[in-house]
Amino acid sequence: MDADAFVANWHAEKERLLSAACMAGTECEAKITAMGLSSGQTAQLHDLLGTFATDVMYTLLLGLDGSASLGNDQRSYTLLDEDGSVIAKEGDLEAAAYAWFQEGRAPRR
């Protein structure tokens, strides 16, 4: 796995979480329904949640890369797969995160 594949998994997880949150029968969906929003307002809320999730994941990835702080601490971390191979060198996660979360890179087929 390289930095791009690692970030692609984060992006896929973001999409899965957003889809699951809006599924009927979930606590999140019940709370949104209880708000009594119009369909337009509900769409705006879903858009807001997507923006928030993007910002959170992007910031966390940059924090792991050393390009942003996590809390009050900014440092680079070495990401290893289960075999001990380095997934990303410094700067690799930042570049991949920008492509996926800011430029909207689509999954490769």
Q: What are the roles of these predicted feature ranges?
A:
Residues G40-L93:
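Amphipathic protein-protein interaction modules
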Residues M1-T42, L70-N72:
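N-terminal low-complexity, intrinsically disordered segments
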Residues A12-E15, S19, M23, L37, ...:
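Generic surface-pattern signal
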Residues A8, L60, L79, W100-E103:
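Intrinsically disordered, low-complexity regions enriched in small/polar residues
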